[in-house]
Amino acid sequence: MTYEGARSITGPFLAVLGASGAVVGFVAGLGELLGYGVRLISGYLSDRTGKYWPITILGYILNLFAVPLLALAGSWQLAAILMITERIGKAIRTPARDAMLSHATSEVGRGWGFGLHEAMDQIGAIAGPLIVALVLYLRGGYQTGFAVLLIPALLAIIVLLVARHLYPTPRELEASQAVLTGKGLPGTFWLYLAGVAFIAAGYVDYPLIAYHLGKGSLVASNWIPVLYAVAMGADALAALIFGYLYDRIGIYVLAIAALVSSMFAPLVFLGGFAMALVGMVIWGIGMGAQESVLRAAVANMISIDRRGTAYGVFNTIYGIFWFAGSALMGMLYDFSAGYVVAFSVATQLLSVLIMLYVGKKATT
């Protein structure tokens, strides 16, 4: 609720503070780049030290409390620093959290388990933007919206501490330990990362989408977070569906998801309100598949002792290509929205081909 509520308005908030489209794309991409780079270190440390809970809790504190501080930002430079801090906090917690989730989901099916996690996550992701939309509707302003999000931030930390008390040793939840042959991470994992890289590079971050919708006056400002909430609703449902399908047909489900999500960019950037609404639903479907199945597949490729490291590598590669794609699409947008569409569609379709090949190798 906290950081998704904030992400629904950071694009237009930066615009109000005087940032250009290139700046919005660069800040969004840089936050992801630095954040995902930190995950490489965080994942390695979580495996070496076994301190999954302390690392996770530290990350959540940074991740959540950077958001209400945005209410005090008076320049786009300061806002950008806080946005990047929020991403770094998420980076610190994510590998350790995902490793703990991989243990907890081993009995129910990792696709379904990670899908359920993503769906529950989206309950807050829907509520957060809607709360911000209500604040804007009541003429509270962007700063007021950020300040109100302090409440769910505090509640989230409380719930996290309760979970730490109830389940102090997550590895004990593992039903069985996967066997990894040879040294290092398996070749299939690296091939899989190539497909992930194309998905990340071509997926337009919401701040740039919100910037486009606001700058072109396609929708009223209070509708921008509502569209994000709609996307998060589609995300939640898609996570459950694709997670369920992954446990039955494997990697092939990612090819299906990428093919579907490749259609969002033309609808969002080249149409009016109705097409943008449909495009945001498809955007949310793609995000749901990414946030559930992409992580579940890593757990099934990697042994228990290397899983934190593998998630760190996975997230770092994802972040590097997300940054490169976001920065490039921000610059492309300043020339033409059509260039953004062409780049996004092309990279998504390339990922389809790679995932089909990975799926074929996994079954032979």
Residue spans for each PLM region:
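Helix-loop boundary and gating motifs at the non-cytosolic
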Residues: M1-L33, L191-A220, I224
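Helix-to-loop junctions at the C-terminal end of transmembrane segments
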Residues: V38-K51, L136, A238-G250, Y333
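Structural signature of the two symmetry-related core transmembrane helices
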Residues: P54-P68, L150, Y252-L267
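Helix-loop junctions at membrane interfaces in 12-TM secondary transporters
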Residues: L69-M83, V268-G279
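Cytoplasmic helix-loop-helix junction between adjacent transmembrane helices
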Residues: L82-I123
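Symmetry-related core transmembrane helices of the 12-TM Major Facilitator Superfamily/SLC fold
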Residues: T144-L161, V340-L356
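Flexible cytoplasmic inter-helical loops of multi-pass small-molecule transporters
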Residues: V162-G182
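C-terminal transmembrane helical hairpin of 12-TM major facilitator-type secondary transporters
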Residues: G250-L294
